[in-house]
Amino acid sequence: MSRTIVLLLFSVITSLSASAKNLPMKLWYDTPGEYFEESMPIGNGRLGALVYGGTQDNMIQFNDITFWTGKPVNRNDDEGAHKWIPEIRKALFNEDYKLADSLQLHVQGNNSQFYQPLATLHILDDNTNEATGYYRELDIDSALCKDTYIKGGVRYTREYFASHPDKVIAMRIRADRKGAINCLLSLTSLVPHKVRSSQTSASGDNNRASLTINGHATGDPMNSIHFSGILTTQTDGGKILASDSTILINGATEAVIYFVNATSFNGFDKHPVTEGAPYIEQAADNSWHLVNYSYDQLRERHIADYKAIYDRFQLTLGNANFDTKRTTAQQLKDYTDNKGGNSYLETLYAQYGRYLLISCSRTPGVPANLQGLWTPHLWSPWRGNYTVNINLEENYWPAEVANMPEMAMPLDNFIAALAANGKFTAKNYYGITQGWCSSHNSDLWAMTNPVG
């Protein structure tokens, strides 16, 4: 009897696990995204993109997790700040809070720097017909983003992914009618920049053109991180015309677009200009590397790399159903309105969190910030910094318990940088010569001083 019960339980558990495993982990919608919160984030741990999926203007915003304002902290700032602490204590003991408040300004340093957006790609469609049958999804199981729609009787399908092994944001546009892809590509940025175009062929199946965008973070260019991004386009059929800062595609059946980037960030204690990384050469190397692979090969390499981490963890909850009738947005609304629960959403929520951390935390010394790695804003909320009193820790709660411990390595490296700068903060601001400290805000440069 007991053996029968065990076998039955094993059968039920196996069935539940197989059922949960077969449920696709997808966010899906039937309209394009209009603003940041409705975009679909993809990332390779350093380079990321926000995909909005517009049918007339498909906007894609690029980010690099190492692209911040500023330069390394001056460790000798406010060397005598700790001398004000006895006066502050005295004012507090005397209940002279106004005086204490004014004195504490002497033990505040500069605020953290800003995490900034990199560049924005606009793909303007020449087909002005109304789009119908729109669908877009973010497939968490394979880290692929896709949208599809019909315009003028033509079915268009677009796919996007961010590859860690090949350091690229990749996109493919397909039409089910020959020569139906006609669009204009433009690359711009909110930070100081210049764009130039180049063309390697005038026509044919191997048409190829590129846009190169070079710029720097907001501020003095001699004290700022610089970047170089290269966008390349190759078509199947049709013609490509590169002009000024745009690429015009006419009469293609398929178009593949790649974006690579490099910055001059070379470490928290290295000046981004005088000691910066050779970002122009690195971007060029990243771009040339792609000629070794077809789009499908890059896609396969990306999926294999991602799933080697993602597939380690499975969450099985009862009564989970993948809803093909209600969009993810509608399901969430119904869930919060208590119109019937679906444990699928809870499973999706957990796996989406894992997806985001895998997508934004694979750069040594640079952990996920308040934005993860995705921001459309020139001045990110709360500077997009590292709020170490809770938010930074929250980002990494799932790293080990959800079986992806290597995602925490950038955080470990960052803590070592905080310790290096923090011993000067402990000495200068608190008169402590043994040990180190960090205040509640930090940035790419491992700032540790207190601020107001």
Task: Pin down the residues of each PLM region.
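Bacterial Sec-dependent N-terminal signal peptides
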Residues: 1-22
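Aromatic-residue-lined binding/catalytic grooves and analogous aromatic/hydrophobic interfacial grooves
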Residues: 21-452
